A protein has these predicted regions:
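N-terminal alpha/beta PP-like core and its mobile active-site loop of ThDP/TPP-dependent enzymes
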Residues: 1-236, 240
Length: 242
């Protein structure tokens, strides 16, 4: 990823923090996505550098944390040959990453030409932040890194939502009305969207108990009468029945 690293050094608008290991870099980017409102970005090198980042990416995927991974890659011709033939390796440390990381990312793309970088960057960012958030990954061959981008590039067109907020709300309220014993499971998404206050206000009006996941543990205080407990393998003392 030497040309990406060189470009990062020459850009005074970006702050780069060097980690001793790619796993630490990926986990740091994950943490940035959790506490901020934008994806943390992780830049890693080819082959083992990319595979070292996978644990941090999987962590971000499972916990719905927005994260952006950019990896260096072998020459685009070498990568294309590997993808076409299925050969395990041709270039030095070259590795076709898509089969390995597609199941733990919301979007993955190998950027095979410089004129497509705007499209992939915009689509990746949209994918990381839209709906249930998560990590995205762009793999950039070394020859593409060192080429000039054209002034005019095709961007990504944001798709229209299939359902409006009012339609989604109506559907949720309809199901809630049919429920005999409603229970709210509040997770990390409630905190990430800044909706904890609105959720608790709604549950209080409707007298609906709340159980939290590990990621949503701070959505509701443990002394709140609506708090039932913590789900998954962690056990907490529930409140008294109302």
């Amino acid at each position: 990823a030497m040309w990406l690293t060189d470009a990062l050094k020459r850009n005074d608008r970006l702050n780069a923090y060097c980690c001793h290991h790619e796993q630490a870099a990926a986990m740091s980017a994950d943490c940035c996505g959790r506490v901020g409102d934008v994806p943390g970005v992780c830049l890693v090198t080819i082959g083992p550098g990319a595979t070292n980042a996978i644990t941090g990416v999987a962590e971000a995927y499972l916990d719905s944390s927005p994260m952006f991974v950019i990896s260096g890659q072998a020459n685009s011709k070498i990568l294309q040959y590997q993808m076409d033939t299925g050969i395990r390796q041709k270039g030095t440390q070259s590795l076709d990453l898509e089969p390995m990381v597609s199941s733990i990312t919301k979007y993955f793309a190998a950027v095979m030409s410089p004129d497509s970088i705007r499209f992939h960057m915009e689509k990746a960012y949209y994918s990381a932040m839209e709906g249930r958030r998560g990590p995205v990954w762009l793999d950039v061959p070394i020859d593409v890194q060192n080429r000039q981008v054209p002034e005019q590039m095709k961007g990504f067109d944001i798709p229209e939502d299939k359902k409006t907020d009012s339609e989604i709300s109506s559907e949720a309220l309809e199901r809630l009305a049919k429920s005999e014993k409603p229970l709210v499971l509040a997770g990390f998404g409630v905190r990430a969207s800044g909706s904890a206050g609105k959720l608790l206000e709604f549950c209080d009006k409707q007298n609906i108990p709340v159980v939290t996941s590990r990621g949503g543990i701070d959505v509701i205080t443990t002394d709140n009468p609506l708090f039932v407990g913590l789900s998954l393998i962690h056990i907490s003392e529930p409140t008294r029945p109302r």
